[in-house]
Structure formats: C-alpha cells, structure tokens
Amino acid sequence: MNTRIIPALLGALLFSGVAEAAPSIYPVDTARFLGGSRFDFKVEFDGELAEKDAKVLINGQDAKAVLDAKPEFIAKEKGADASALLLRGASLKPGQYKVTVESPTGKASANWDVYGTPDKPVAKNVILLIADGLSMGHRTSARLMSKGVTNGMYNGKLSMDTLPYTAMLGTCSVDSIAADSANTASAYMTGHKSSVNALGVYADRTPDSLDDPKQETIAELLRRTTGKSIGVVSDAEIEDATPASVVGHTRRRADKAEIVDMFYSVKPDVIIGGGSAYFLPQNVPGSKRKDNKNYVEMFQKEGYALATSNTELSKAVKGNPDKLLGLFHTGNMDGVLDRKFLKKGTVSKFPDQPDLTDSMRAALSVLSKNPEGFFLMLEAGLVDKYSHPLDWERAVYDTIMFDKVVAMAQEFCDKNPDTLLIVTGDHTHSISVIGTVDDNLPGELMRDKVGIYAEAGYPAYKDRNGDGYPDDVNVSKRLAVFIGNYPDYYETYRPKMDGPFVPSVKDEKGHYIANAAYKDVPGAQLRIGNLPRTESTGVHSIDDLVVGARGPHADAFRGFMNSTEVFRIMSEALALGNK
C-alpha cells in the first residue's frame, strides 16, 4: 500500500465517525400518547445560543403556537452549559405530529402519534391489579403449590388463569432494554415510556430530579376531567415505585418524602400500604422525613379516616368513610408466609397487618360508593421484594395471595359488568420451576436430590384446610425453583424458615459476597454469581409480561403490545381522550 495515502484515509475515517451534535426532544421520537392529556415539551440544545437562533417547529408551525403553552427559554441550563426551551402543561389534539429543531449547535426531529378515544365510555370502573415482578415461574409455582396436579392435569386453575383475554407486554425503557418498577408502572399510568428509576417524567440532563418534563398520570387526568374516585393500594411502601406511579413525577424513585407530597396533591380517595415513616414529621421516632410536616394529620384534616392496623381498618370501613388512609408499617409490610405461618420478618413488631385481600375489600367498599365510578390500582409489591433476594417461596405464597385478590375482583365484575379488570405484572424475573427437591433421595450433595424429568414426580404439599396455601412450605419433597441471575450466595435448596433470605453481604472492598450465615446449612452449595459484584440480589429480566383482562374493552388486549398500550386501553374504555 502507498504509505502516503494512510494519513488521508485515517483523516477520512475519523471525520466520518464524528457525529453532529443533536438536540434532545421530549416527548421522544416514536412517542404515542393521549390527545388532550397534559405533558411538558422540552428541547435541550447542545450548546448556548440566543433564542432567536432556535427554530422549533411542529408540523411546520411554530411550536409555541401549536402547543398553546407558555414558553420558557433557558439561555444556560444549570449543569449543562447549554440552552433549552421548555413549555409546561402542553396538550395536543389527536393526529400525527413531526417536531423539527434547527439551531447553530445541531438539528433533530421527532415523530409523535397522538391518539383519541371514543366519545362515550364503555366502562364505569377500572381495576388494575399488578403483582410486582409477576413472571410465568411465579404463576406456575403458585398453581402447583395451591392447586396440585393429578395424572398430569392441574386440580384447578388460578383465578388469573380464567381471564378471557390475554396479551404479551414489552417493557423496554427509553434509555435501556432493561427496566425497573418505576418506569414500567409509569408507562401504565401515563402512556409514555420513560427511563429507569423515573416516574411520570422524561429524564432530562438537569441535576434536579424534580424538574424533568412531566407526563400527566391517569389519576391527574381523572381528577381534572371526571368525578371518579381513585384508589391506590400496596403492601409495599405506598411511596414505592409502583404505587407512586399513580401520582408521581420524579427522575429519582427514591424521592419518597416528595412523593408523599404528590399523593397529597392528587388526594386519591383510598391510600393503603406501608411506608408511614415518610408521612410523619422528623421529630417522631422512625420518621424518614427531613422536615416537620405531618401528612397523617394533613390527610385527616382533609376528611380521611385513618387506620394503622387491620383491626382499625375493619372499624374504619364500618364507619362508611368517603376517604381512607391506611398505613400499617413504617416500611414494606410482611408477606403472607411470615404473617400467617412463620411469624418471622417484622411480624412481632407489626402483629396486626392486613392481608392484601383485606385491603382490597376495604378499597372496594369506599370506592364503589361513587356513582360516577372509580379507578383502582392495587399492587402485590412483595412478589418482587422476595424475588430479588431469591426467596422464591415467599414470593410464590404472595402470588397465591394476589390471586385471591384477583378472585375478589372477578366477583366484583360479576356484579358490576361495567368494570374493566386488568391483571399483570410490571416487569419479570428469571424464575423457573425445573422439577422437585426430595430430601429422601440418596446423595451427599443437595443437588443430587433434585428430581428432573420423570424423577421429578410430584411435590408433597397439602392444603387440608382449603385456604389455598400449602399447610407446610417445608415438606420433604418440594418444588425445585431457581432464578437465572444472582450474586454470590449459598443455595440451600430449602425454604428460609428463620426469616427472609439475605443472599449476600458486602465485604471490605465493597463487593457483595455470599452470606456466610447460610454456609453451614446441611448441603448448602456456594454459587458464584453471574452479576456484577456491585449487586446484592437478583435483578429484573427483560422477558415479556403476560396481561389478562375481562370486561368492557378487554378484547383490545391481544398479541404482543408495548406496555404503554395498557394506558391507552384504559383511556379508551373511560373515553378520556381530548376532554
């Protein structure tokens, strides 16, 4: 080769690899959202410029005029050393829109599909039931443990198995193929995709987690355009990602004190869950607030009946309240395996926590009083909380509990056929049933006691009292369930009878290593993790979700769908478009 042309070739290659700086547009390209819903429009330029040099058009017209919102031009955005254009509270009529941005620092474009809804609603009520992290492995394990199998045939179905319409949901994020509960639940509540850890916003470049471009949630939309009641129920902290998605706007899901203020702003008629530590002023023992606001008292002054135990919840419901605040734990509540059977976790400290079925019953009692209807989001949050630390038995017992809530919802739908019921998770875990573990099989290693294929046979769970739960989780022949991603940990092949599983602990280098507390469990096997050593538990998988539905417009769930379609179907059923 002629060496004299090498510099020229290198120069050409380097030049071709340099991308032109491009502004960022929010809502993002490919966004599909509801006509008439509110959103913040933002353009982030890649350098400082004068407002007159920024050309922002929507379908060839000035964006400020099209969006009918007050613009704010930021000459130098904090932390960016670049300019931005921001319009808060914009809305659009249904149609196809193309946004084009040109400036001395670069150009960009985005296409939006803004959809409408029918003029008249087909549903009066919407019940959205979410088991956080619900995966096929949870469902299969719950059916095996709760119903059993005879000669290859299940002895019964889960209630969620009987929903007539099903689809697969994709949960990818704006910034990643992976997702967390914040932005997956937010997709259901806003119809917009978002970024990992974000709630009701497009994550922008500013350091402030609370100033990002907002997406109106279904609760805000209902408050603004209807007289319907709103309910939010969880057995996790009520400020946690999934329940927070009903009202929240933050780039950082950990802004839990601020999320309580967002609950207070929207004021759902029913708020039930854990997380009282963020409602109480900082001078109260156990509070996690950094101010003196007492949101318990503030909600009570707004007419909310208060319950802090299951006994108080029953009493409050008998009082026929119009609004209900139930806070039963300073943090996440305990799952059914600990509450009902083992009495571990924090049950001794919080002995009178309601079951999720109790919370569902209370919520329906209050919400169904409204002749204009209601929207209820209920989360079984601990399915995820236990799946992360590989504590699959606790996760599956809570899946069985969740299915009891589904059965209650179906009974409500039987009596109220104008109710759309949607049942799903918000993301998945890589959990699978691969056979059984039989303590009576020979072998020194527990792995040799794992039965696969024909050797699996059937587990020995019994449900003599007919409550749907195995009477004993620690039977001699039990399910072999494994999760496909994990930190270093000791696999014991047994349920954790002494309390929730803590698979790993941090060493002096800041890496997570297997928790030696399980090292001497007979037959325990050290498993070297397949995740980065910064991870203490398993993580979410990117597998598709299953969604089931019944009621008005449930037939819209079919095939594969993006998770944002859940919002669209709810909006269509309630005719919320362009109000």
Model-derived regions: residue spans:
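Active-site nucleophile/metal-coordination loop of metallo-enzymes that catalyze phosphate/sulfate
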Residues: P23-S24, E48-K52, L67-D68, I74-K76, ...
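Edge beta-strands of extracellular beta-sandwich domains
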Residues: K107-G116
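Aromatic sugar-binding surface patches on proteins
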Residues: P71-L86
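A post-motif C-terminal structural segment
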Residues: L134-R139, R143-S186, D240-N578
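Short, compositionally biased P/S/T/A/G/V-rich stretches that sit at domain boundaries
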Residues: A21-L34
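Gram-negative bacterial Sec-dependent N-terminal signal peptides
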Residues: M1-E20
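Aromatic/hydrophobic beta-strand junction motif of beta-rich domains
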Residues: F39-G47
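Short, aromatic- and glycine-rich surface loops/edge beta-strands on solvent-exposed regions
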Residues: P94-P104
